[in-house]
Amino acid sequence: AVALDPRLGYYAFEYDPRFVATGIDLAPLAMPLGKAQEPFVFTDLPELTYKRLPALLADALPDDFGNSLIDTWMASKGVAKSAITPLDRLAYMGKRGMGALEFRPTRGPNIASQTAIKLAKLVESARQAVHGEIDTEHHTKAALAQIIQVGTSAGGARAKATIAWNP
């Protein structure tokens, strides 16, 4: 679990005792299971890079393209960019991140459904998002939701999507 420590202003990470029992050491140098009795907090990491998170979690944050999609989505829901926390961004990554980690909020809906996509429409919607042309019309909102579903995790300087193909 991870939560903001109000005293320090940094996010504290604590292993669930059931996970500790598995013996899987996610970050053996920085957050070893042998020291899992107390929450881990890293106030010495550069805030700009790590967003006040442990490195293990900061590595899973979306890239600039993914962040712009999340910002646009949240704005359509009336949430200002300044109100979006790193935990919100991790929650939006869900199971779509590159790597083994998955994230979910402790409260709220847990939506996990697979849908077919139209690649040509997805590419056009991604172009619109990159150029800041996403508007608030229904079809564009649906396209944005689909881009967020497949495109917030691949990382890198260019927009891309991670999709499964089953002919």
Predicted regions and their residues:
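Phosphate/dinucleotide-binding and metal-coordinating scaffold of catalytic cores
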Residues: 1-167
